[in-house]
C-alpha cells in the first residue's frame, strides 16, 4: 500500500442521519436569526429611547418665562405644607399653556386652591421663573419646568370635563367617608385604597418604609385586581366585546381616580393588555406582557425611569412572575404548611424583586419585611377590596351611621399601622 493512505471502510450515510443533520442546521440558523433580530430590535429601541430622553430633558429650556395671566389647570391634587404651624401653605402644580409650573401659595389663594382637585381650572396671575438648581433634576422628572410666584387666584373655578367631574366627585365622597376615621387612620386608609398619601405624617411614612410595607400605600396590581374583582359580578354578565369595553373603562377610571401614579400605570397597562389578549384568544406569557408594558411606558414617558415607584412596582411584579412558584415548591419541600408556604413565597418573591430599586433609592433593604408582610398584607388586602365601596356608602350617610359603617375599616387600618410600627422597632434592633 502506498505511503500516506488510510485503510478503512466506506460507510454510506443513512437518510435519517442526513435529515437529523439538516434539522440541526436549520435549528441553529433559526436561533441565530432570532437572536440577531432580538439584538437589532433592542438596539433600535435603545437608540429611540435615548433620543426621547434627550428631548424630554431639553424641553425645559424652551419653557416660556415671565409674567402670566390666564387659565391654569391643576395637574395634581394640592398638598398642604406645614399644616401644624400657623404659616401653613399649599403646594400645587399648574399647567399653563401646556407647561407645568409649581407654586407655593399662602393666605386667601392657598385656601381657595386647597379646596379643589386635579383637572379643575381657574384664572390666575403670577410670575414664571426657573426652578432652583438643587430641585431642577427632581422637578424635571415630574415634567415641572419652572416655579410660579406672586400668584393671585380668582374665586371662580371650572370643574373640567364630565369625566374629571365624575372622578373628583368620587374622590370627595371618599374623603368624606374617610373623615369618619381619626386623622391618621383616615390618611392611611386613603393611601391603601387609592394611593393618596398627602396627609400621612412623617413618622407613619418612615414606619412603613423601615418595616418593608411602603408598597401598601402605592396603588399597584393588587388594587387593580381588587377593583376588577369588585366589578366582576357586573362584568361577567356582559357579552365578550361589551365586557372588554367595560373592563378597559374601569381600568381608565381607576387610573384617573388614583392620579395615574407610575405604579398604577404599569398595573393598568398590564391588565389592559392581558384583557385584550384574553378576548382575542391569544396566550401570552406574563413576563412578556410586563416587558412590553415597561418598554412602552418608558417610550411614552421617559421620565418614568426616574420614578422609584415605577421600578419597585415592576420589580415586584417580575419577582412574582419568575420566583413565586419555585419558592412555593421549595418551601413545600421543606415541609412548610401550604397555608404559610404560598404567602411566604409571594412575600419573598416580591421582596427580592424590589430589593435593588429599594437599595438604590433609600440605601437600605428591610429584611423584616418578609415577616411584616405576612401579618399586614392579608388585612390590608381586605381593606383594599371592601374599603372603596364601604367608604363611598359611609360618605353618603350621616356622621353617626358613617362612623359605624367605617368601624371595621378602622380596626383593619390600625392593625396594618401597628404591624408597621412593630416592624420598624424590630428593624432598628436588628440594625
Residue ranges, per PLM feature:
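N-terminal leader/targeting segments
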Residues: 1-62, 124, 144-152, 162, ...
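Internal transmembrane alpha-helical bundles of multi-pass membrane proteins
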Residues: 262-431
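Structural detector for short beta-strands of small beta-barrel domains
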Residues: 65-85
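Short, charged beta-turn/beta-strand-edge "cap" motif at the junction between a beta-strand
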Residues: 127-133
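Divalent metal-coordination and catalytic microenvironments
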Residues: 72, 126, 192, 220, ...
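Short nucleic-acid-contacting surface segments enriched for D/E, G, S/T with interspersed K/R
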Residues: 109-125
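Aromatic-rich juxtamembrane segments at the membrane interface
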Residues: 143-267, 275, 426-429
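OB-fold (S1/OB) nucleic-acid-binding surfaces
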Residues: 83-104
Amino acid at each position: 500500500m502506498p505511503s500516506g493512505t488510510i485503510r478503512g471502510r466506506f460507510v454510506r450515510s443513512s437518510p435519517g442521519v442526513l435529515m437529523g443533520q439538516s434539522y440541526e442546521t436549520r435549528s441553529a440558523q433559526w436561533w441565530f436569526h432570532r437572536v440577531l433580530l432580538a439584538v437589532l430590535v433592542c438596539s433600535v429601541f435603545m437608540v429611540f429611547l435615548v433620543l426621547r430622553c434627550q428631548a424630554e430633558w431639553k424641553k425645559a429650556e424652551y419653557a416660556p418665562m415671565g409674567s402670566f395671566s390666564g387659565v391654569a389647570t391643576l395637574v395634581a391634587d394640592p398638598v398642604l405644607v406645614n399644616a401644624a404651624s400657623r404659616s401653613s401653605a399649599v403646594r400645587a402644580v399648574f399647567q399653563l399653556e401646556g407647561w407645568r409650573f409649581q407654586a407655593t401659595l399662602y393666605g386667601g389663594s392657598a385656601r381657595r386652591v386647597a379646596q379643589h382637585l386635579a383637572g379643575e381650572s381657574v384664572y390666575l396671575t403670577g410670575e414664571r421663573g426657573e426652578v432652583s438648581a438643587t430641585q431642577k433634576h427632581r422637578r424635571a422628572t415630574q415634567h415641572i419646568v419652572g416655579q410660579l410666584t406672586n400668584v393671585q387666584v380668582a374665586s371662580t373655578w371650572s370643574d373640567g370635563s364630565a369625566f374629571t367631574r365624575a372622578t373628583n366627585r368620587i374622590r370627595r365622597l371618599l374623603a368624606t367617608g374617610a373623615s369618619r376615621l381619626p386623622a391618621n387612620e383616615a390618611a392611611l386608609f386613603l393611601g391603601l385604597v387609592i394611593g393618596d398619601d398627602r396627609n400621612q405624617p412623617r413618622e407613619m411614612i418612615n414606619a412603613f418604609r423601615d418595616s418593608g410595607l411602603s408598597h401598601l400605600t402605592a396603588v399597584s396590581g393588587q388594587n387593580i385586581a381588587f377593583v376588577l374583582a369588585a366589578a366582576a359580578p357586573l362584568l361577567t354578565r356582559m357579552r365578550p366585546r361589551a365586557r372588554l369595553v367595560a373592563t378597559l373603562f374601569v381600568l381608565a377610571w381607576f387610573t384617573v381616580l388614583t392620579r395615574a401614579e407610575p405604579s398604577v400605570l404599569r398595573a393598568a397597562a398590564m391588565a389592559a393588555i392581558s384583557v385584550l389578549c384574553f378576548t382575542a384568544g391569544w396566550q401570552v406569557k406574563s413576563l412578556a406582557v410586563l416587558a412590553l408594558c415597561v418598554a412602552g411606558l418608558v417610550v411614552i414617558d421617559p421620565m418614568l425611569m426616574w420614578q422609584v415607584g415605577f421600578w419597585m412596582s415592576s420589580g415586584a411584579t417580575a419577582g412574582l412572575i419568575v420566583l413565586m412558584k419555585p419558592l412555593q415548591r421549595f418551601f413545600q419541600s421543606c415541609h412548610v404548611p401550604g397555608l404559610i408556604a404560598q404567602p411566604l413565597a409571594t412575600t419573598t418573591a416580591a421582596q427580592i424583586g424590589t430589593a435593588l430599586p429599594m437599595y438604590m433609592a433609600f440605601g437600605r433593604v428591610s429584611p423584616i419585611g418578609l415577616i411584616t408582610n405576612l401579618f399586614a398584607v392579608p388585612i390590608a388586602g381586605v381593606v383594599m377590596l371592601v374599603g372603596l365601596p364601604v367608604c363611598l356608602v359611609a360618605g353618603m350617610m350621616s356622621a353617626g351611621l358613617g362612623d359605624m359603617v367605617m368601624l371595621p375599616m378602622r380596626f383593619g387600618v390600625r392593625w396594618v399601622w401597628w404591624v408597621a410600627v412593630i416592624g420598624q422597632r424590630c428593624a432598628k434592633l436588628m440594625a
